[in-house]
């Protein structure tokens, strides 16, 4: 398959990078305008601590009020069991659960070790039983960590294997959180993952940033490796509030 699905993530990744609070009404208007562009999937926000990311504290209200085409798939991000509860209560049926590969970034992001975050995910996911939503597991810092530098590919592979063991039907987003990934690194990691793990039940997505003007080049390398789901954000907005530099 040569078609590429572009996921519009500006309402989550983009908005969270904007410091002045955006009025809920303005967010709704922008999201409806983005939906009119013809995307098939949109990441509308996140259910996380409002103290950590106040910009997205109104995600539930946005979901209630926004008017979107029936064909548009809506996904929302969570990072723990509490976020999962909030998302499910808000009617979210497509979930993005994020865990960092690097210990330092995961602690900065959710104040837990990687193992603690994964155990929380495994427990919460198993507890849903048949009421599970569609799942994307977002692995942050797959290439670079602001504190630890280059992330070993083996570390990513281990978490991919753990993800598949817990959720055999899953989309796994391989994320270049800082935008420091090089094209050869992207090609190498995705080549390894696609050859070994890609299947009709396990798909991979690429989430990158254009910090060093390599966003498009890296996306092309992911495509060459077989990836057909790529995140994008209107206006190039985006960035992790917990990743300095």
What are the functions of these language-model segments?
Residues 1-19, 96-109, 132-147, 189-201:
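N-terminal small/glycine-rich loop or linker at the start of catalytic domains
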Residues 1-82:
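N-terminal capping/small domains of soluble enzymes
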Residues 5-13, 40-44, 72-78, 95-97, ...:
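Hydrophobic faces of well-ordered beta-strands that scaffold small-molecule active sites
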Residues 6-28, 72-81, 106-113, 142-155, ...:
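Active-site mouth loops of central-metabolism enzymes
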Residues 40-65, 99-112, 141-148, 173-183, ...:
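Glycine-rich, proline-tolerant flexible connector loops at the mouths of alpha/beta enzymes
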Residues 52-76, 115-135, 158-163, 186-206:
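Alpha-helix-loop-beta-strand connector modules within alpha/beta enzyme cores
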Residues 102-161, 165-177:
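Conserved anion-binding
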Residues 175-245:
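Catalytic alpha/beta core domains of metabolic enzymes, predominantly
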